[in-house]
Amino acid sequence: METVVVIVGAGPAGLATSVCLNQHSIPNVILEKEDIYASLWKKRAYDRLKLHLAKEFCQLPFMPHGREVPTFMSKELFVNYLDAYVARFDINPRYNRTVKSSTFDESNNKWRVVAENTVTGETEVYWSEFLVVATGENGDGNIPMVEGIDTFGGEIMHSSEYKSGRDFKDKNVLVVGGGNSGMEISFDLCNFGANTTILIRTPRHVVTKEVIHLGMTLLKYAPVAMVDTLVTTMAKILYGDLSKYGLFRPKQGPFATKLFTGKAPVIDVGTVEKIRDGEIQVINGGIGSINGKTLTFENGHKQDFDAIVFATGYKSSVCNWLEDYEYVMKKDGFPKAPMPKHWKGEKNLYCAGFSRKGIAGGAEDAMSVADDIRSILATLKNN
């Protein structure tokens, strides 16, 4: 099949890219490996998830949220928004298409994308002038290699598989990772009566959603360093010194940290209070080894657990199928070019949703990619 643009991934960034291209009447096809769009939100998000950012930072092009929508949305409200977005713009991804390879054919200056239809088992070949990688930052769940992990006698899961603490009442559960997922899952487990311990390796900023909302609004008018100083000061006033509870604050500000490392500040949902009250235990460092249900930590501490939830992020799988990834990506699956031109590569290869700026970043990428493709096509037409 031939088309002008192939988009790989039907998450928010992929959907937005298709809509933006359609606004310019540019033919495009979305290939999605799952059987539904936005599978991260529809299949892999835990039940109590709420968006930590205000609604104006969680919307896609050409369809802002209405006044009736609360400032901070639940998962259900955002999924409903995505459903309405797909219906309004009549987006029709090709589902159950696992991309096996993508290469640039120098002989005809086109991308050759090979995908497997996992329902029929057939191999499909797509040719396009432009290729957009929109699989996003959250690819495959990352579970680190730990000595003896295969001997663990309890349940092991990645945070993307976690739904609710309902089944963990009275069980000893370790959550590995002190980011937003780890902190929120710990809170949920504790609420359902699990004996919860969270393992935190690196320092993280902890703020309220209101403070981060203020900070993101101010970033439109003030430099990052100034906003970081204000946000950090407010966090100190609200929480005081949390180091005695095992929560350490980085030296670099929250927005600078997010910008340069991709690590977002933790938006507190009530976890800090439970840590202060001793309802959630904190261990700093990493896991040394596992033997049955007994875990030995790097600090020498030993403890038995019934379950481990790895909230240890994701790893990009882009380089596994994008053979010519070096035109836009590094080996870690993130853009080579610095912001704000991170979305544009060579040979008409683009990426959307890799800016480490969440939904808003994916929306910005989508508009930039579509505008650039429109400009290139217009130039070719005039020549």
UniProtKB/Swiss-Prot annotation:
Induction info reads: Up-regulated by drought.
**Keyword line:** Auxin biosynthesis, FAD, Flavoprotein, Monooxygenase, NADP, Oxidoreductase
| Catalytic reaction equation(s) | indole-3-pyruvate + NADPH + O2 + H(+) = (indol-3-yl)acetate + CO2 + NADP(+) + H2O
Which metal ions or organic cofactors does this protein require, according to UniProt? FAD
Entry EC no(s): 1.14.13.168
Q: Which Gene3D superfamilies match?
A: FAD/NAD(P)-binding domain
Q: Which Gene Ontology terms cover its molecular function?
A: flavin adenine dinucleotide binding; indole-3-pyruvate monooxygenase activity; NADP binding
Protein residues bound to FAD? 9-14
What Pfam families does this protein's entry cite?
Pyr_redox_3
For NADP(+), which residues are the binding ones? 177-182
Give the pathway listed in the UniProt entry for this protein: Plant hormone metabolism; auxin biosynthesis
Q: Which GO terms describe its biological process?
A: auxin biosynthetic process; response to ethylene
Instruction: State its role.
Output: Involved in auxin biosynthesis.
The record's family statement is: Belongs to the FMO family.
| This protein's name | Probable indole-3-pyruvate monooxygenase YUCCA10
**Organism of origin:** Arabidopsis thaliana (Mouse-ear cress)
